[in-house]
């Protein structure tokens, strides 16, 4: 299963003007897969979610996002190994084309990737020449201490989705 979308979206292709090839990981947001990957989701966030924009409207895309989310939950260690291998492969491809490489792991999720370890290191530490970036609604994610991980705090709506 391919985990990352590699410069296949219009927004990501714009990064080439700045010397970057980019990849993004799309999981099934909020609780769409049965697992909550957006811990601080508000009604406004869930309503405005980009999950179904563009190609995201297609059933096959939604199924793939659910499958990736389930794979991440079922065997996180294997998921991290697969993700790391894909990052390394795409980074080499970007480098060979004369580009830097950037990865957004929370395309349609808000998980603490800086806390998930593989051989004692997170994905950012395993790939120091790759620039990672994300948006988050979890303020504590800003204090991660990883040099090549840029996180932007996104304002949290005061209206939260009520739990059943």
Tell what function each PLM region has:
Residues 125-137, 153-156:
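Acidic, His- and aromatic-enriched active-site or binding-groove loops in soluble protein domains
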Residues 110, 156-157:
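Short beta->alpha junction loops/turns
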Residues 1-129, 140:
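Conserved Radical SAM active-site core
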Residues 100-104, 131-133, 148-152:
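Structural preference for beta-strand elements that scaffold enzyme active sites
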